[in-house]
Amino acid sequence: MARVCQVTGKAPMVGNNVSHANNKTKRRFLPNLQNRRFWVESENRWVSLRVSNAGLRLIDKKGIDEVLVDLRARGEV
């Protein structure tokens, strides 16, 4: 399973570790992904999503029903 948020599309990005001596080595910044179940009242069922913390805040703001409409329009769920 890819490390991608199903709501926001956040994915790992690449950067550098920088030491005190300014040596640089490649590293990955991973999104803060959580596996969460959401109760969808309109469908009377649970929906499991792999979402980032930013995605959880978006669901709190817009509501799970509106987020699912957007996901289905993109063809993700």
Swiss-Prot record:
Name of the gene: rpmB
Record-linked HAMAP family: Ribosomal_bL28
Database matches in InterPro entries: Ribosomal_bL28, Ribosomal_bL28/bL31-like_sf, Ribosomal_bL28_bact-type, Ribosomal_bL28_sf
Keywords (A to Z) from UniProt: Ribonucleoprotein, Ribosomal protein
Similarity annotation: Belongs to the bacterial ribosomal protein bL28 family.
Protein name: Large ribosomal subunit protein bL28
Keyword Ribonucleoprotein found: yes
Lineage: Bacteria, Pseudomonadati, Pseudomonadota, Betaproteobacteria, Burkholderiales
GO biological process: translation
Record-level GO cellular component terms: cytosolic large ribosomal subunit
Residues making up the signal peptide according to the UniProt record: none
GO MF: structural constituent of ribosome
